[in-house]
Amino acid sequence: MTAAPAAANNAAPAPKTPRRGVLAAYLALTKPRVIELLLVTTVPAMFLAQRGIPSPWLVLVTLAGGAMSAGSANALNCVADSDIDAVMDRTKKRPLVSYEVPRRSALVFGIVLGVVSFAVLALGANLLAAVLSLAAILFYVFVYTLVLKRRTSQNIVWGGAAGCMPVVIGWAAVTGSVEWPALVMFGVVFLWTPPHFWSLAMKYREDYARAGVPMLPVVATPRQVSARILVYSWATVACTLLLVPATSWVYVAFAVLAGAAFLIVAQRLHNSIRRGHAYNPMKLFHLSNSYLALLFVAIAVDSAVGLPSFVA
């Protein structure tokens, strides 16, 4: 971290934005909207592992443990990235930057959340789910946040592995093991992550450049970025079809139709940039959220209705 922002973070000037309540400020540290998307992938993974509807208690425990685990990683990320957040317009209202939560308190909060999440998953689900959850926290904080994010344009590619863990945790909570469908779902989220975040980074390119974060849109041309987005989008859709043997026609129909819409928008973004036309990467960003959510809802619906899978 640079010396100036670090020193500034120890001061306590009056924030320029209205203060939240204490609970709201700590909640904001956990990045609830990010947690929501992570949990959207957890429950369908549990449905597929059960090939039906799993125990409501197990679902509740896994969601609670998963939410606290993700919240822990996000809070610790806010601590490590407070210098970056202070100079980015998109993140300058976060609690540490606006001095609503002391840095030390945020650190303790993140650690406590992680410990509690491990205990909840270990006692309420199983040890494997708890260990995978802890591994995700450590990877996100120490590998992505402290190493990859500030050093390579491939930061989100490899660092995104932490965001793929909820599907594996959900599967492990039900089965006590990790099997090939869980790895396929991991692959889907892994390949989906670059198009999702690179489209956002295209919008906030100047923000990342000002903060010294080498996101791909900062170090590459828009055409190069959109070309890679297109490649990863195709790879994502192809990976979704690897789940066909474990599902029925319900999932396949959703996967094909939603995948086609995802690819069309990614292709349009690339075409607009290649032809020198005006473009809006946020269309792909917002669609990518809906695409992943619908895809995993399809997995849950397919598992709940109980139709025979293509490979029994």
Swiss-Prot record:
It catalyses: heme b + (2E,6E)-farnesyl diphosphate + H2O = Fe(II)-heme o + diphosphate. Pathway: Porphyrin-containing compound metabolism; heme O biosynthesis; heme O from protoheme: step 1/1. Its main location: membrane. The keyword Repeat does not apply. GO terms for cellular component: plasma membrane. Its EC number is 2.5.1.141. The keyword Protein biosynthesis does not apply. It comes from the Bacteria. It is found in: Cell membrane. GO terms for molecular function: protoheme IX farnesyltransferase activity. GO terms for biological process: heme O biosynthetic process. Signal peptide: none annotated. Keywords: Cell membrane, Heme biosynthesis, Membrane, Transferase, Transmembrane, Transmembrane helix. It is a multi-pass membrane protein. CDD domains: PT_UbiA_Cox10 (cd13957). The chain crosses the membrane at residues 21-41, 53-73, 105-125, 127-147, 156-176, 182-202, 225-245, 246-266, 292-312. Converts heme B (protoheme IX) to heme O by substitution of the vinyl group on carbon 2 of heme B porphyrin ring with a hydroxyethyl farnesyl side group. Carbon 2 of the heme B porphyrin ring is defined according to the Fischer nomenclature. Belongs to the UbiA prenyltransferase family. Protoheme IX farnesyltransferase subfamily. This is Protoheme IX farnesyltransferase 1. It comes from Saccharopolyspora erythraea (strain ATCC 11635 / DSM 40517 / JCM 4748 / NBRC 13426 / NCIMB 8594 / NRRL 2338). The gene is ctaB1.
